[in-house]
C-alpha cells in the first residue's frame, strides 16, 4: 500500500487534516467557554459546526462526483486554513469575540462535508479496486486515532502555550494537509467513469 507514492501523500495529508480537525473541536469549545463563561456557548459553538455538516452532507457526495476531487479538497482545506489564520489574527490583536468563533465554525462546518467524501474518493482512485479495502482500513484507522490524539494534543498545547499556540499548531497541520494534496495527482470526477 505504502509503495504507492500518491497514497503515502494522501495518508500523511489525512493524518494531519484529521488530527487538526479533531483537535480544533476541543480548542474551539474551550475558547468559547473562556470568551463567554457560558455553558450555552458550548452548545452554540458545536451546533454551528454540526448543522451545516448535516445539510451540506446531503449534497457533498453528489458534488464530489461531479467535480475534480483534488481541487475540491484543496479549496476546502485552504478555506479552513484561512479560517484559522483569521481567528489567530483576531486573538493576537485582541479583537476576538464569540461571534467570530461562531462564524468561522459555521464556515468549517460547511467545508468539511465536501472535503471528506472527496478524500475518500481520491483514495479509491489512487489505489484502485484491488487495494481499496486495505486503503480504507488505513484511512479509518487514521480518523479513529485522530479522535483520541487530536484533542489530547490540543489540550496539552492549550495548557502549555495558550490558545494562540493551539491555533498555530492547527494552522501548521492544516497547511501540511494542503501541501500533501499536491503530491496526489488530479482525479477525474465520478461522471467521467472514475471510482
Task: Give the residues covered by each predicted segment.
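Membrane-helix boundary and inter-helical linker elements of multi-pass secondary transporters
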Residues: 3, 34, 65-66, 94, ...
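Substrate-agnostic recognition of the 12-TM MFS/MFS-like secondary transporter fold
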Residues: 9-25, 49-62, 68-80, 100-159, ...
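Extracellular/periplasmic helix-loop-helix junction of adjacent transmembrane segments
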Residues: 23, 27-52
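MFS-fold secondary transporters
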Residues: 24, 33, 86-91, 108, ...
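Transmembrane alpha-helix termini and helix-breaking/packing motifs in multi-pass membrane transporters
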Residues: 29-35, 88-93, 149-169
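Alpha-helical transmembrane segments of multi-pass secondary-active solute transporters
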Residues: 42-45, 72, 135, 166-170
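C-terminal ends and interior cores of transmembrane alpha-helices
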Residues: 78-95
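Helix-loop junctions on the cytosolic side of multi-pass membrane transporters
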Residues: 94, 121, 125, 163, ...
